[in-house]
């Protein structure tokens, strides 16, 4: 288990200790910095809902450094981002691959960012199934449905034609921030917090 730093906050009432992620949550910053799976997705969804309840008019900032993961877990986060009232700004730090790239481009239009040396990757969903032939066929059909759904979502958020999305996602498609901006996954490449603040205005 990795160590999570504890930070001390000085207030008029004394000192209070937070783990680093809880302290940043107070600043409306959410981290998606691991493989996307059900447990972490539930935590991210809960944080999004909490921040909406706290202030439905104030922006949320989602920092993404993820290799991707389970499609349904990623869609739970994506749907919640679209569902809540606050605008969700997304920022790629390191990598946003597979479902991580969908979350990146699913942020508020004009508020989707990447740091200069991040990597973004899109591809079609994969599945490995074992069992009876009928069950394998059922799962294969479901994978194709998910593939079509993801293609439609990428098309919606990037502005690319569906046929171009389908072709681009046929294999692992790695992009630099410049390429991701041209593709429509992000809106701006930033190297400082000031640049992020200025581009959001």
Curated annotation (Swiss-Prot):
EC number: 3.4.21.92
Catalytic activity: Hydrolysis of proteins to small peptides in the presence of ATP and magnesium. alpha-casein is the usual test substrate. In the absence of ATP, only oligopeptides shorter than five residues are hydrolyzed (such as succinyl-Leu-Tyr-|-NHMec, and Leu-Tyr-Leu-|-Tyr-Trp, in which cleavage of the -Tyr-|-Leu- and -Tyr-|-Trp bonds also occurs)
Active site feature: 98, 123
Molecular function (Gene Ontology), one example: serine-type endopeptidase activity
Protein name as annotated: ATP-dependent Clp protease proteolytic subunit
Predominant localisation class: cytoplasm
Assigned protein family: Belongs to the peptidase S14 family.
HAMAP family (alphabetical): ClpP
Subunit field text: Fourteen ClpP subunits assemble into 2 heptameric rings which stack back to back to give a disk-like structure with a central cavity, resembling the structure of eukaryotic proteasomes.
Top-level class of the enzyme under EC nomenclature: hydrolase
Keywords: Cytoplasm, Hydrolase, Protease, Serine protease
Top-level taxon of origin: Bacteria
PROSITE patterns in UniProt: CLP_PROTEASE_HIS (PS00382), CLP_PROTEASE_SER (PS00381)
InterPro entries cross-referenced by the UniProt entry: ClpP, ClpP/crotonase-like_dom_sf, ClpP/TepA, ClpP_His_AS, ClpP_Ser_AS
Function description: Cleaves peptides in various proteins in a process that requires ATP hydrolysis. Has a chymotrypsin-like activity. Plays a major role in the degradation of misfolded proteins.
UniProt cross-references to PANTHER family, sorted A to Z: ATP-DEPENDENT CLP PROTEASE PROTEOLYTIC SUBUNIT
One example of a Gene Ontology biological process annotation: protein quality control for misfolded or incompletely synthesized proteins
Subcellular location: Cytoplasm
Keyword Cytoplasm tagged: yes
GO annotations of cellular component type: cytoplasm; endopeptidase Clp complex
Gene name of the encoded protein: clpP
Any Pfam family: CLP_protease
Lineage of source species: Bacteria, Pseudomonadati, Pseudomonadota, Alphaproteobacteria, Rickettsiales
């Amino acid at each position: 288990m990795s160590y999570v730093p504890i930070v001390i906050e000085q207030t008029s009432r004394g000192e209070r200790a937070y783990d680093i992620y809880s302290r940043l949550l107070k600043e409306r910053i959410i981290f998606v910095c691991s493989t996307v799976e059900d447990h972490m997705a539930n935590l991210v969804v809960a944080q999004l809902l909490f921040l909406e309840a706290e202030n439905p008019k104030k922006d949320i900032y989602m920092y993404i450094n993820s290799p991707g993961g389970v499609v349904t877990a990623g869609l739970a986060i994506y749907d919640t981002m679209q569902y809540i009232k606050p605008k969700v700004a997304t920022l790629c730090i390191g990598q946003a691959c597979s479902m991580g790239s969908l979350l990146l481009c699913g942020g508020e239009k004009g508020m989707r960012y990447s740091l200069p040396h991040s990597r973004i990757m899109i591809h079609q969903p994969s599945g490995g199934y074992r069992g009876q032939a009928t069950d394998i066929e059922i799962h294969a059909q479901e994978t194709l449905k998910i593939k079509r759904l993801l293609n439609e979502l990428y098309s919606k958020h990037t502005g690319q034609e569906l046929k171009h999305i389908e072709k681009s996602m046929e294999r692992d498609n790695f992009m630099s921030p410049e390429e991701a901006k041209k593709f429509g996954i992000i809106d701006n490449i930033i190297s400082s917090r000031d640049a992020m603040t200025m581009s959001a205005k």
